[in-house]
Amino acid sequence: MKVIDQFKNKKVLVLGLAKSGESAARLLDKLGAIVTVNDGKPFEDNPAAQSLLEEGIKVITGGHPLELLDEEFALMVKNPGIPYNNPMIEKALAKGIPVLTEVELAYLISEAPIIGITGSNGKTTTTTMIGEVLTAAGQHGLLSGNIGYPASQVAQIASDKDTLVMELSSFQLMGVQEFHPEIAVITNLMPTHIDYHGSFSEYVAAKWNIQNKMTAADFLVLNFNQDLAKDLTSKTEATVVPFSTLEKVDGAYLEDGQLYFRGEVVMAANEIGVPGSHNVENALATIAVAKLRDVDNQTIKETLSAFGGVKHRLQFVDDIKGVKFYNDSKSTNILATQKALSGFDNSKVVLIAGGLDRGNEFDELVPDITGLKKMVILGQSAERVKRAADKAGVAYVEATDIADATRKAYELATQGDVVLLSPANASWDMYANFEVRGDLFIDTVAELKE
């Protein structure tokens, strides 16, 4: 870890705990800052706040009092999930207090080079693929960021012999200033999180922050399946390395079932260890990064062939009497579910879908669900999903929760079928996050097997 003194004796407010806030508070304290933590959860239900207080860090819980900002803070580090229209953040910005996310702290202290991965879908799988390929090549890829390991925590233990492979959300990237990866990947850009950002253009602008400090010596890996990505190439100083499944590009591409990098075959598409056209895109992005880091083709091929996927991302759960169960709880938008379905024969799929109602209609999903064996529909968005099923001519049943949906899907399936949880919706109408939803699916499958 680089020892920096820019925060020494500076008053810093950490707004919101969870993993990233707790990690940021500890790091800032270690760097000599005068830290105050403010979290909305009551103290008695807040183990993180209790632990920080025991370590001598000032903690204010149970709400976000605006008068707290009457103190002269030099900096605010916010939890990425807290939107910028939060009154505390608005007041801080009005007072001229810089507002960062914990990712910026990670960059400032990291001795390791950084590879940053963002995008609407495929971030976690691509991040994991890259980490595994680099580690197999002896470059020790350390996963961090939105993948569940706080970036500032991992950066503290990383040396210059490691590589920080960092998954980055749009929420995190809104709060960076000096952040400078040597390689950045944008997997794709689709209209998501509009409720947070206000518009698609603002969402894209947040993602685009990943390359703000990059130079011609750095590499920006972009998905040339999208015209938007092509249009953005003129707006960066970085050297663009494209990938595509639709055309031959000066980077990584699919041609005649083979994955190439700049004219050289790396492996066959059907050798990738996880199904789906979206995973071909993820593998191509990984190949581009790996080749930029001088990884040999055999290591790439062996690692991606053995890749078993990521929990909650088209994760194979079990096989019960010839019925295969896949957990794709991370599919919180329509595009992710479309890509999940592309890896299967619809006539053998019982799809579990529905969740938080964000006002979306699901007409885009109609061609993708046409021909499904059955659907099991649940959640706030059930009426909208049912309308799409009716348009597609797919029979469905309704369920009260994930456990009920899983049991009903199994009843509808026969030997050779697939039960696929790919909700096309966020989980927050019923569950704290997609992980909880996916874990309940896994638990119910285990019960069905008993």
Swiss-Prot record:
One of its GO terms (molecular function) is UDP-N-acetylmuramoylalanine-D-glutamate ligase activity. It is an enzyme of class 6 (ligase). Pathway: Cell wall biogenesis; peptidoglycan biosynthesis. It is found in: Cytoplasm. GO terms for cellular component: cytoplasm. Belongs to the MurCDEF family. This is UDP-N-acetylmuramoylalanine--D-glutamate ligase. It comes from Streptococcus pneumoniae serotype 4 (strain ATCC BAA-334 / TIGR4).
